[in-house]
Design a protein with these regions (language model features):
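Active-site neighborhood of glycoside hydrolase catalytic domains
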Residues: 346-463, 469-474, 479-481
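Short, compositionally stereotyped local motifs that mark structural "simplifiers"
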Residues: 578, 582-678
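Short beta-strands within extracellular/lumenal beta-sheet-rich domains
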Residues: 8-37, 42-50
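Acidic, contiguous N-terminal accessory segments
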Residues: 11, 84, 88-91, 95-190, ...
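Flexible, acidic glycine-rich loops studded with aromatic residues
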Residues: 438-446, 451-618
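Extracellular carbohydrate recognition and processing domains
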Residues: 18, 48-49, 54-101
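Feature activates predominantly on carbohydrate-active enzymes
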Residues: 111, 116, 142-378, 382-386, ...
Length: 678
């Protein structure tokens, strides 16, 4: 997007893509108000790039309110796409969907849960009422996460093939008795996962979240028998983990705000008020906090894979090491070449976010970072499953103007920038192999390279995140390519498992939609075996499934939870059970009757589906996706609240287009439903 001032005395400059500063001599005139006229041209590539407001910035870099007011057209609720289509989700379509869901709205049975249990044999109708654990025993089984519950009127006997299996057995027993307060029938439950890894990638870089919130999310993950957290700790916009020998990563890289020169901290991007000391913009985990967090996760059966993006998505690391050089004179960790004239633009529109593999600094940098991370895991007494290097989205031309890269490629017989990227991945794999740790990366480190590269690198790669491309057929090609090359894929495709996507195209829904929209049913339909394998034999090579929660649009802990729940139940189902289990209707009934109320009792926020609405003659009828939820409505075009009339039957309204409805259930509320224009 371009912005220009109309008055030649005013100045406008782009700080970073989509973010500008404006200077005007009138700002110093002491007037009560100032009018600055600007002309904008183009489009923002993603909704997440918009700032929250217009701010003034004082000499210390602190934003202050300038009383900016923008007029919005609120008269037309329709959601227009780039192609000019009305993409609002209207009442009649939702009514039909809710009607279909209610065909299978029977209350769940005592052993219904997500992920669903493999084998339940009810032995009598006698009930166990207190859920007391009578015994725990380790048994041999082909699957290391196999467990068995023997439920008798006296209590529960637990058997499991491993420490992790026993922990999952205890959690399953706890859930059974929480959701069946009158008691659980006498039964034998045998359960095991189809995939060894069932995880979440959580980004705390774009917007920061405390370890207290992360522990709450980990508790929710463990409850659903998820066992892996890919912790996204470094990206273009921030660095969130203390690395003691490189303090600039925190003093510079853990803050973000409005600045014209980025000398003290990076420029503001994504949501937030631009305060470099604000909760979303500023934050990091100390070594001691991270060690404690690793132990917390380990106690709940969750392994943590730390992720530090490279060679792309490295803007903050590059600038933090520039800051180190400016303030200490130490250039040994320089990550880019001052003489580099490369012109490129990343997926996030950055022009300066790729470190240079032809320099010694990046290897020195990651040698120090990885040593510190390994030491933290050793101190915590837990396994480091892999060191995730990112490896994705390196823009074309990133090193085309680098004299060092040109000379390096000639010296090492590297043909192009793709070969230089491959060299980086291989060097990182070798570095970590010397330390006894495998690497992991996004699919970009595994696909479109020759067999010689794959033979050398694949044995040192624990897994690759198969996030697939916009073209699904090409995505299947990448999955097959990764398998054929000897890499182990973790299915993370954006079509089912990007949980920062909006639930629908309704304009009130939170989240991005660059790859479509995803509700819990779309995630439930994310069968890993349909994405990667070339044959049934390849299905055994799939490591599992993983949800992705990118943080560009996350502005609060409660919003994080609304993105996760109830989609996390669907993700857990597909990771535990590779084949069909729930219909949409049965899954929705389980959520409505059991899981959403339980989330509310445990203090989690969650997303709520919306009510349906349609005209029948001169009256408006409404319906709910959940049996016990309340529909509240208005007839004057205003947004319904808890104090609005409760829907109990058909509504007559002089203007049907002015009727609005929302669903309310256990503290949550839906987006607003309305009728289409005639």
């Amino acid at each position: 997007m371009e912005m220009k001032t109309i008055n030649p005395a005013d100045t406008v400059a782009e700080l970073i893509p989509g973010s500008y500063y404006i200077a005007s001599p009138r700002f110093a005139a002491g007037a009560d108000s100032v009018v600055v006229d600007v002309v904008c041209h183009g489009t923002c590539p993603q909704a997440s790039f918009r700032t929250d407001a217009v701010f003034g910035v004082d000499a210390a870099g602190k934003p202050f309110d300038v009383g900016f007011r923008q007029k919005f057209n609120v008269g037309d609720p329709r959601q227009w796409s780039m192609e000019g289509r009305d993409e609002m989700v209207y009442g009649p379509d939702i009514y039909a969907l809710n009607e279909a869901l209610q065909l299978e709205a029977a209350a769940p049975g005592p052993f219904d849960m997500a992920p669903s249990l493999k084998n339940v044999r009810i032995t009598s109708q006698k009930k166990c009422r207190d859920g007391r654990i009578l015994s725990e025993k380790t048994v041999k089984a082909d699957n290391p996460e196999f467990y068995r519950l023997t439920i008798t009127p006296a209590g529960v006997e637990i058997e499991g093939a491993s420490r992790a299996a026993l922990a999952m057995a205890r959690r399953t027993a706890k859930r059974l008795f929480e959701t069946n307060p009158s008691g659980v029938p006498e039964a034998v439950v045998e359960d095991w996962p189809d995939y060894p890894v069932r995880g979440m990638m959580i980004d705390v870089v774009r917007n920061f979240h405390s370890l207290a919130q992360m522990k709450k999310i980990v508790d929710g993950m463990a409850d659903l028998r998820l066992n892996r957290l890919q912790f996204h700790l470094a990206d273009d916009e921030g660095w969130r983990l203390e690395i003691a020998p490189l303090p600039e990563l925190i003093t510079y890289g853990s803050r973000r705000g409005y600045t014209t020169d980025e000398r003290l901290f990076p420029a503001q991007i994504y949501s937030g008020a631009g305060d470099p000391d604000g909760e979303l913009n500023h934050g990091y985990y100390t070594r001691a906090e991270f060690v404690d967090f690793l132990r917390y996760c380990d106690e709940r059966g969750i392994t943590v894979v730390p992720e530090f993006e490279s060679p792309g998505h490295a803007r903050v690391a590059i600038k933090a090491m520039d800051f180190r050089e400016r303030t200490t004179g130490d250039s040994s960790f320089r990550l880019h070449e001052p003489a580099d004239t490369s012109r490129y633009r990343s997926a996030q529109q950055y022009r300066d976010c790729v470190l240079n593999p032809a320099l010694p600094g990046p290897y020195r940098f990651f040698d120090v970072v990885s040593d510190e991370v390994i030491a933290m895991y050793r101190e915590a007494g837990v396994e480091l499953p892999a060191f995730h290097i990112g490896g994705d989205e390196v823009p074309g031309g990133a090193w085309s103007g680098s004299p060092a890269a040109t000379a390096f490629k000639a010296e090492h017989g590297i043909e192009d920038d793709s070969g230089l990227h491959a060299y980086w991945v291989e060097r990182m794999a070798e570095m970590m192999a010397r330390k006894g740790v495998k690497i992991a990366g996004w699919q970009d480190i595994a696909t479109d390279y020759n067999d010689s590269y794959s033979a050398r690198v694949a044995p040192q790669v624990d897994y690759v995140n198969l996030w697939v491309d916009r073209n699904f057929r090409k995505g299947v090609k990448h999955g097959s390519m990764a398998l054929r090359s000897g890499f182990t894929p973790l299915i993370c495709d954006f079509g089912h498992f990007y949980l920062d996507f909006a639930h629908s195209t309704h304009p009130e829904e939170e989240g991005l939609n660059w790859g479509g929209v995803i509700d819990e049913f779309k995630t439930l339909d994310g069968y890993a075996g349909n994405v990667a394998p070339r044959s049934d034999a390849d299905k055994t090579r799939i490591l599992g499934v993983q949800g992705q929660l990118w943080a560009e649009t996350l502005r609060s802990d409660s919003q994080m939870e609304r993105y996760l729940f109830p989609r996390l139940f669907a993700l857990a189902e597909r990771g535990w059970n590779a084949d069909t289990t729930f219909t949409h209707g049965r899954f929705n009934a389980l959520m409505g009757y059991r899981e959403l109320p339980r989330l509310a009792r445990r203090g989690y926020s969650f997303h709520l589906r919306q009510p349906g609405m349609k005209l029948e003659g001169n009256r408006i009828v409404m319906n709910s996706p959940y049996a016990d939820a309340e529909i509240r409505y208005t007839t004057d075009g205003t947004t319904p609240t808890l104090s609005s009339p409760l829907y109990t039957g058909p509504v007559e309204a002089a203007d049907p287009q002015a009727v609005r409805a929302r669903l309310f259930y256990h503290g949550a509320e839906s987006v607003t439903t309305l009728l289409p224009r005639r």
